Each structure stands twice: as C-alpha cells, then as structure tokens.
Amino acid sequence: MMWAGVWLLALVTTCSGLYEDQIGKFDWRQQYVGKIVHGAFDTTSVDRIIVATESNVLAAISAKTGDIVWRQVLESGSRGEVKLLHVSNPSATGARVGSRGHPGHDVITVTGSLPALVRGWNSNTGTLEWEWSLLPSVDDQAAADAVWFEHDGLLYHVVPVWGSHLEVTPYQAVSGQQARPMTSRIAASWTAKDRCALTESFFACTSKDQLLALDLAADSSSAILSKPLGAEGVGRPRPVRGEAAVIQNGRYYSLRTDQKLAFAGKDAALVDRTIQEGEPILLRGTVDRVNNRLLIVAHRLRDFVKLDPIEFTIDYSDTLGDPELISVRCKQSNSGNSGAGLVCRMLLSAEDGAILLIQQGKIKWVREEALAEVATADFLDLTLSDAEGAIEEELNNKNGDVYGAFQRRITSQALHLKNLFLHILGVGPAPSKAQRAGLVRDDFGLHKMLVVVTNSGKVFGIDNVSGKHHWIRYLPSFVGFANNVPMKLLVQRTSRFYPLPAQCVIVGRDRMTLNGLLYIFNPITGQPVQGGGVVELPYSVSQISLLHKTGPDFLKALLLLDDKNVAHVVPETLEVYADNFYMFTANHQTGQMNGFHVQYNPSSTKASKLTTTPSWQIDLSGGSKRQQIIACEGKNPIEHVHSQGRVMADRSVLYKYINPNLVAVATHGADNIHKYIMNVHLVDVVSGSIVFSMSHKRVRPPLHMVHSENWLVYSYFNDKARRTEITSIELYEGKTQTNGTVWSSLDAPPLPMVERQSYILPVAVSALKETITEKGITSKHILIGLSTGAVAEMSWALLDPRRPVTSPEKAREEGIMPYMPELPMPHEILVNYNQTVANLRGIHTAPSGLESTCLVLVHGLDLFVTRVSPSKTFDLLKEDFDYFLITIVLTALTTTSFVVKQLASKKIVKQAWK
C-alpha cells in the first residue's frame, strides 16, 4: 500500500489534462494520404475518388472538397505496398468489368508479396469485407518483382524470372481459387528488370531497338508481339493508364493495334472509355514551364479526331511538379448534343506528390501530399511589427551624441502620434504585407513560422498557430544523402537582428550528379536570396556544420567537408571564422569514424585558405568486423544548461559531466553466440576518445536516441524477452567540478561517473525527442512517439537511472522514486489525446518566448503541432484567471492603505499633543 501511494503521488504530479473546450485551441492536425500510385472515380458515388498511395494507404477523397472521406492505413514497408487497385463497374480509367459483379466490395486491392494479401473493401465506408492470402513458392526477390492485373473478373499473378520465363496464375477474385489447374510458364528470355513494365494485360519490354510484348490474358500467350523502335530503347517503357499501350523513345505505341503517335517524354497520357460509350479517348497533358500553363487535349484513338469540348489551358504553378493523369470522369450537361456539353473532372498527381482535381478548365482543389514525407523542419521567429521595428532601429543606432539621440526620440514619438491619429480617422498608412498575413511576432513568442522540408524537394512555410500554408517552394533537383540521411535545414540568421531578415539554407544532393546543392532563402517570406537561391557545388558533401561565430551581418557561415576531406566555407568571405574548427565523419558500412582539424592559413596561395588535417580515427566494427553504425546522435546546438549540478541528500552537489563535444554512436551486427549485439559508445569528437561504452546482447533495431545535457536515452527491441526496452544513462564529474566556465576536450578531463538503468515499455517506440526551452530552467521531459500514433510526455523522474533498486530510504530524501522495471503509460500523459498521427516517424521541438513552454511538431503520414509545458505554465496566467476579482482586491487594498495612512497620521498627531 505504501508503494502504491508513492506511485499515485508521482503520477499525479507528472500528469496533465485537457478540457474538452481546449481541443484544437493550442494544437492542430492535418491528415494526408501520400502520393498516388493508383486511382479511379467511384461510379457508385458522384463525390468519391478511390486512391492507393506510395505511403501504403487506401483512401476515399471527396471530389467536391478534397477532404478525406475515409482512410485505411495498411501494413508498413513492403508488406503493405499496393500492387493492384481495382474498382468494380466501369471506372474512369476504362477498367473492363467481368460478368460477375461483387456488391458490397466494389474495391479490390492486392498488397505485399510474401504473402500477398487480396482484400475486398466497401467503397462507402472503407470497411474490409473479405480477405485471402497467397504465399507463392518462389524466392524473396522473385516475389517482390511480381505484378498483378485484373481481367474479366480474374486476378492474374505474374512472377517474372528475368532472362528466362514468366509464371502466370489466374485466381478467382473473391474465393482465391485457381481459375486454371496449372500455372502457365511462358518463355521470355528477352525480359530484364530495368527494361520491362506491365500495361493492362500486356507485359512489355525493350530489347535493343525493338519493343516486345506478351498478352498474358490471351489464349495463345506464346505469341510475341514485336514493334520496331527505330533506335535503341532507353530505360523502362512508360505504361499508359487505361489502355494496352506504352510510351518509349518519345512515341506512343499501341499494343493492340499498329497505332504509333509522337509523344514527348514528360507528357501525361490517359485513355478513357466512358466519355463516348466505349470509344477509347486519349487525353494528353503538356506543361509549358515558361508561362506556367498546363494544356490538356483529347483525341479519339480510332481516327485521332480532336474533341473540342475537352481542351483546357490551366494556370499551373511552378510549385507543382510534372503532372500525371490518373483518372477522368465526364457527364453530359443538360443542354446538349453528344460531346458538345461535356462536363469533366480530371484527377492529376504531380511529381512532387500533390493531388489536383481539375473541373471545366480550372483547378478545383489541391492536396499537398508531399507533407506525408517530411525530411526535416524547424520553428523560426517571426519579424517585428513596423512600430516595434522602428523602436528597435532607434535603440540600435549607436551613432551621434546625446542631443542627436534626443532629437531622434522626439521625432519618432511625433511620428507615432501622427500615425495613431491617422489610424483613428481611418486614413493611416497601409499595413505591411507581413502584418496583413498575420506574420508578426507576438509578446510570448508562441507564434512562429514552421519551415518544413519534404523528401520530394518541396518546402513549406506553415503558420504554427493556424496551420495555414503561407508560401511553398519546389526544388525538383534536391534529394537526400546516402544511407537514407535526409536533407538538412540550417538557420544562418534569425529574425532578432532587425532590420536584417532571417536566412536559412537547405543542404542536399543533386538528383543527377549527386554533388552538393544549397538553397538559401528567407524563411518568413520564402523568397530566395540573391537570384534563384540555388547554389550548385562542384563536389559531394560528406559533413555539414554551422560556424559558431557570426560575420559583420550576424550571418553564420556554412562549413562543408567534401568527399575528399577538403573543407569549404559558404560564403567564402567568412573563411577566417573556420579557424581551429573540429569536424568528424562516420562510415555506416565499415564502422569507421575519422576526426579532422580545420585551420585558416591567411598566407596560403591557394583559392581556399583552409587546411584540413586528420586528427584521429576509430574503428567501431569490432573484432569480427561485423558491426555497422546505425545511429549517431549529438546534442542540440541551441540548448542551454541552467543547472550544472544535482543536490544530494547530504546537501552536497554532484556535478554534471557536460561535454558539448560528446556524440552517441550506436553500432549493430551479427554475432556467432548471441545472434546479434548492439553497442553504444560515447565519443568525444574533438579528441577522439571513447568516454563510455555499453553492450546489449540479442538486441536489434529500431533504435531511437535522445542526447542532451549529461544524459542519454535510447530505445530498442529486446529479441530475447520479445519486448521494447528503454535505457537511460547519466554522466557526472563527481563532487568537484573540473572547469565550470570553459570546457576543453584537449585537457584530458577525468572519466565520468556513470549511472545507467533500463526500463520496459508496454508499446513499440517510433520516435524520441526531448523538450527544450529558451533558458533551460524548465524540467526536461521525454516525448515518446508510439507505434499507435500517440505521443507520450514522460517525466525524467520516471526515466532517472538513479532510481534505487534497494535501500530507497536514502533516495527518498532527494525525491527519487524507487525502481520499478515497467514504465506506466496512462492516457493522461498523451499530448495528442485522440489526434493520432499515422505512421509516426519523427518529433521536432523548439523553444518559445516563454520559459515554461516548448513547441512540438509530430510528423508521419499526418502533421500534428502543439505546445507542452513540462513544469506547467508558471510564467503565464491561466485562461480562466479572474481579472475582475483581482481588480476588486487591488482596488480595495489600495483604498484601505490610503485610509489607514490617514488614520495613522491623525493618531500620531493626537499622541503628539498629549
């Protein structure tokens, strides 16, 4: 009972609640589906589009508003990859309908490969009606390369054995029974993985200067169709939706007829059979990037006669990638003849992931599905208002004497009075563009610009209060780095240095050359700096860092280390600030870490005056050379450590080991005895010394790490116990501090005291992040992203490695709870209550203007933005604060003090006359 009471008190002090009327007041969520792979208009409803996406999502989208009607998130990874989407009844993509209808499950999907799951869905509600699985007796690679198509009510499973043959098996869609007793083996020695594609029931490949194809649904499948290309085929042929045709070498080739049409490589194509009652109509989309226009035309395939009612020229923003026509649906208007009164809706998918609906030559709505794949993000302070900017500019003016300053103050005050008078009359100066958009800094620093960079190269400026997209930029040539390392977003200058604007830089790789690319821009307006803002680097980037010192314009330079270990500074005029700088690189495959010392040599005759010298090297691959680096986590460069010690029960101080150069490195590899081993090393990247190492046996990823102040927290999966565990490590110098002002890794400080402890989590972890505040005074909590889509705010008191296993009496004086292996996960600690984030992948935190409050972004398939207060809002009045009552109390106290003062003075006078 005593321990139960202690636990209850601990949970009461750490939990936080949310009133019903506060839902959506401090947070918002935006839901997405991802980039479309398959899609069709649902003919059972005029307001529903069925889509399957790259994010393993099956969803229905409203054709009127673009909102999600229903959404089913399938299995993650290759198990949930949608290989086929079939919408029963005549669809806008011309899908042929078998003689057998299947009411109640008018949507069929095939996902995964080992096993392949065939499912029937209800398009009205999105509920699963039936399911069957197929486990083919082939190897993993062949199963992954398998494709599916639907023909006359049968599902065909095609397994290509490259360079040999094709294995084709038809199945009944609902029951899963084989329609034929034997699997057909069709000889196809001309097939190759990078030169073949499936279009309708045809399997087409390029072979030198020929296009070869097989109709897999025909009775005589052994007949090979051959078409001359005129030149050697380059790459895989591009299938045309809705028709057995491909686009190759700038031409459209029909596989059912001898038709051949000239076609540009990036032109979108779609064939539809519902516009003119079974007549195949070819729709073609061409983008004019000079004028930002999209031209869509339609021709009858039989005689290539143009359909004038379907010819649109649409404004197509440069923030949208090249389009792909997914589906079309046309109906006859009330006024007319056949073809003359067509009203059409067209579904498009852009290369950047955006989903567009075009109706009668205008874009009806756009869904920015690039936000379903967030690479990195950051919160930026907004600019000052015009009045605050004028005051700031006056205070920053250091020139002149006291009389000049007095004159400027009088002039500015007179100008403020004039503007106030004109504003009262309604004829004041027009507000600035930022003020009209509401992009002005608030008093508490809670209103910020959220800059989000996506994997497709699209950049968004989002209001963190309302969720509005203020600006969008598309960088089609930008991709992430090797080993799935995403693009980097770095802040070179914040909005504090008025009137200089804020400046950020995005670092990535060129999609074609793999050399470094920079995009320098203003994060508040989204406008590029100096021309287009894109800087092409003549080298590949292996490491990135911001310099600590700023130049004359308060700009932090960017230090880059190329693949030849040569240092570069952007801009080059700030090279002098890179002197005596240390960098490191980590090779994930070999487990090697290397340190470098960068020096500035003003007497150098080379173009760059920087020299890079190797300083240390560490091999973390182990004796078996099997260990590979799976994670490398440093500390947040903007964090502040307020308290450098911890008060013990005997009133002594245990000083924290606060090493800003400490990096946590995790390696993982197979082992002959323990199956696999994970090692965690704390490495000083300036001196190259390993401060601490820890080994976990029979442990495997996913691994998530948080490194802050003097502690490290990481989660992993314990394969032996079949559960998720989380380990916390704390480092202390001892009861004497080496140097409390300046830390130097070259002075060989003593090895730290290490406290460590492991705990059990009842649910799998998807992300970890610590809260951060402006001064570091507020207690730090750990935000745990769960596989369920929830985010738990875990107090450090529960993760404290000093929680005693025995003798809890001593620790009770310090307020430390006794050790229990299981960590509680009550609903009260979930910061997103029922606003779950599907496929949660990351959490980003940033300080606000209030020391008590931390801003949080949770991203996955959805976006969720909120704010948390680990130590409550001690610096902010509550919303329900009774201002009327406090006014009455203050008025009464003030009046009483004056009355008492008068009475006391009269009493003193009377006593003096006695």
Kindly label every feature range from the protein language model.
Residues 3-914:
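Secretory-pathway ectodomains
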